[in-house]
Amino acid sequence: MLEKEIRRPIDPAIAHRIPPGQYLTEKFPVLHYGPTPKADLATWDLKVFGLCAEPFRLDWSAFKALPRFDQTVDIHCVTRWSKLDTQWGGVHIREIIARAKPLPTATHVLVHSDNGYTANLPMSRFDDSDVMLADEFDGAPLEPDHGYPLRLVVPK
């Protein structure tokens, strides 16, 4: 059974961090359709292709060998919840962009997930200072309900 989020008044000291119409949560809501995908790290890979000079594929060990990036950010879901000071670990998206060498004609990025979800972003937003591919949340590996083994994090 789903627990109902108790919505309390927002402390005025942090109210500026909550967009209009959002509510603050301490939980990390699970929002996906259908069964939770199961990833086998022995066969998992990250494919980067399309309008780039250097398409490539990384298996899990190659991804984990990339330089690490950690950040603490507020996240605001389109379903109207906000969670402050979330801690993420993974790889800065600029590591991936530098390897792929996008062509000048690449204006958008289309991201695919194992379960069929897609999201597109303008290249200018994808190449932002806080965008990352995260494999950790709050110092632990991502859980399957939250995107294990890898999740695109776009805080803004």
Model-derived features: positions:
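Structured, non-membrane catalytic/scaffold regions adjacent to prosthetic-group chemistry
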Residues: 1-156
